[in-house]
Every structure is written in C-alpha cells, then in structure tokens.
Amino acid sequence: MAFLALGINHKTASVDVRERVAFTPEQLVDALQQLCRLTSSREAAILSTCNRSELYIEQDHLSADAVLQWLADYHRLSLDELRASAYVHEEHDAVKHMMRVASGLDSLVLGEPQILGQMKSAYAVAREAGTVGPLLGRLFQATFSAAKQVRTDTAIGENPVSVAFAAVSLAKQIFADLGRSQALLIGAGETITLVARHLHEQGVRRIVVANRTLERASILAEQFGAHAVLLADIPQELANSDIVISSTASQLPILGKGAVESALKQRRHKPIFMVDIAVPRDIETEVGELDDVYLYTVDDLHDVVAENLKSRQGAAQAAEELVTVGAEDFMLRLRELAAVDVLKAYRQQSERLRDEELQKAQRLLANGGNPEDVLAQLARGLTNKLLHAPSVQLKKLSAEGRVDALAMAQELFALNEGSTDKSPQ
C-alpha cells in the first residue's frame, strides 16, 4: 500500500493554469473511474476548488509519473507544462499534506474553514464513484479528525483575516443578534459580495444592495435573497438600516453627514454601525462625529486583520504540531494494519492444529484412555505441531547465515538471552 497526494494550487500555479486543471462537478465521477482504470491506482479522490486541484491516491506501488501523465492528458496539457506547477507528496508526506489542507494550513486565507467542507465533498463524490476503499477511507476519516482537533484545540479559525469578514465580525460585536438587523450594502464588487455572503451566513434579517447600476445590484442581491436599489435610493433605506457597509470606486463621498443625521432622527437615535471600506472614502469623515454612529474605515479594519493574522500565525504553529502528530499516528496504525492479515492466517492455522489434536484426544478418551496420559499427549502434540513450521524455517535461515532473521525471531517470540531454565547448583 502506498499513498500519493499531487496537484497544483494558488502557490504553484497561475489562475490560467488552475482554470485549465480544474474539474467541474459533472466531470468528477467519470474522471475518478477513468483515473483508477488507466493508472495503477486502486483508490482515488479529487479535490477541485478555485485555489487548488489535488488527487489523493492509494496504489500498490508508487507511480506518480503515470498519474501526472493522466492528469495532463485529461486536461489536454503537455506533461512538461503540468510538471512546472505540480507537486507530489508520497506516503507520510501525503498524509500530512492532506491533514494540512483540511485544517486550512495550506489555504490562501490561513485557517479558512470552507476547505474542510470541500474536502468532505471530495470524499462523498469518491464514494459515489466507487473509488474509495478501506485504506483511503481510513485516511479521510483521520484527516477529518485532525482538522476537527485543530479547530477545537487552537485559535486558528477564531479571528477574521479578510476585510469583509472583519467588518461583519465588528457588526456582531455591536449587535448581539444580527437576525434582528437590517444591512445596507453600497457597491457590488468582490468585497461587498464577500460581505453579503458573511452577513447572509450570519442570518441577517434583511439585506439591501445599492449600486450605481441596478443590474449589477440585482445580480448580487439574487445570490443572497437581498433587495436591489440604486444609489439615489440610499436616503430612504438609511432609516431602516442598522448596518451600513460601503465599498465603491467613487471618487467623491456617497454618504454625507446630513443624510445620516436625518436617518438617525427617523430612527429615534437607534445606533447605526458603518464601515467604509472604500479608498477614496465613500462616507464623509464628519459622520463619525455623530452620536449613535459607529464608523470604521478600511484602515481600522486592516489593523484588526493584521492583529488577527498574527494571532492565527501563532495558532498555526500549534496546529502544525497537531497535524504532525496526527500523520505519525495514522502511519503507525497503518503499519499495524499490515500485520492483521498475517495474524489472522496464523490464528486460523493454529486453531486448525488445535482442533486436530483435540479430536484425537477425544477419540482416545472415548476408547478408555487414561485422562492424564491423553492430556499430556494433547499438550505434546499441539506444541510440536505449532513449533514445526517455525523450527524448519529457523534452521533454514540459520544455514543461510541470516543472523538478522534469527534476531528478529528472538524478538518476535519474546525470548531473552539466558531465559532457558537452569538446574539449581
């Protein structure tokens, strides 16, 4: 048995290459079955995300070249082009790599939790394809356990390390229950999209997306069950908004002190939490002087992110230690597993010899044999039969000068030097 983990990720390959090596969900089952059919892979799973495409494989004998060739052929790449971005991990390193990936230690955003769910999906698809057996299945379960322990025993996932997530985390500190809050998001770019996703996941009661073009706002709003409006509609929406997060490319402020003052009066001075992620700023700085307004800028968030990233990096050291222990423990149990078949066969052989001697003893007793003599004969016969094959093999190994094998036999049978009985002087 041998494990392989190979592929490309955001650190080794450009977006262009990652796009070309990616698998669509519809391709995965057929790709897995083809991979096992055309290479020497007995078990296989594929993890394909925007940041990585990786193959996790169990083989009788390591054959990474054949798998890389298959991957290149499948995506119509030259092998040299793929090799320039690919990495290969074998055996213990493959196990450790899987555990690091599932724990978020190899992610673009250190400690991000989504990768574990993606890993579980990869396992589920491989089971559907029938390409996961007992060994790779055990590795996945050990990987999930290691990732869970990292989440439980370290702080690697506790602090936000993206501006969008930091903004939502600050909102949670201001409002105890986001499920009762309404959010107004200004803009429709990547950052606001991430903010919308985080707010949606936190169960915010209502999200309104305001943008210069209604079409862009509507596309974003549809993803999260939100409501789309134009920038001109912001004054009407402000009075109902507990959370306002803005990130546009406007060169002039979009929200002024007067509009916010008016909204606060309508809200009877119920607090508004505001985050201005834009550069230049979307919200006039004077807004922050108003009572009942909590205004944060992108610089405030970067300070939070930097501090939290430092915290995560400290937690990552502890996480790496847990992963190392997890990988070593798995490999130890795997090596122990290799002895199971041998032990099972030896037990079956011993039980057959025991049954033969027991039947012989029962016949002797039935014919009136002396019980003590029969028991003694049973013990001698069973001992001789159990020792016969090992004795023959040990003599053969000794004749061949296999001192190492003799030493191993002494360890196997727990024989200590000078352990033979000696008559008292």
Swiss-Prot record:
Q: In which pathway does it act?
A: Porphyrin-containing compound metabolism; protoporphyrin-IX biosynthesis; 5-aminolevulinate from L-glutamyl-tRNA(Glu): step 1/2
In terms of NCBIfam families, this protein maps to:
hemA
| PANTHER family, per the entry | GLUTAMYL-TRNA REDUCTASE
Task: Give the top-level enzyme category.
Answer: oxidoreductase
Q: Which UniProt keywords apply?
A: NADP, Oxidoreductase, Porphyrin biosynthesis
- Which positions in this protein are listed as binding NADP(+)? 187-192
Any GO BP: protoporphyrinogen IX biosynthetic process from glutamate
- Which residues constitute the catalytic centre? 50 (nucleophile)
Additional facts recorded: During catalysis, the active site Cys acts as a nucleophile attacking the alpha-carbonyl group of tRNA-bound glutamate with the formation of a thioester intermediate between enzyme and glutamate, and the concomitant release of tRNA(Glu). The thioester intermediate is finally reduced by direct hydride transfer from NADPH, to form the product GSA.
State the protein's name. Answer: Glutamyl-tRNA reductase
| Cited InterPro entries | 4pyrrol_synth_GluRdtase, 4pyrrol_synth_GluRdtase_dimer, 4pyrrol_synth_GluRdtase_N, GluRdtase_CS, GluRdtase_dimer_dom_sf, GluRdtase_N_sf, NAD(P)-bd_dom_sf, Shikm_DH/Glu-tRNA_Rdtase
Write down the superkingdom of origin. Bacteria
On whether Signal is a keyword of this UniProt record, the answer is no
Q: Which organism is it from?
A: Pseudomonas putida (strain GB-1)
Q: Name one GO molecular function term.
A: glutamyl-tRNA reductase activity
Q: How does it assemble?
A: Homodimer.
Quick one: which gene encodes this?
A: hemA
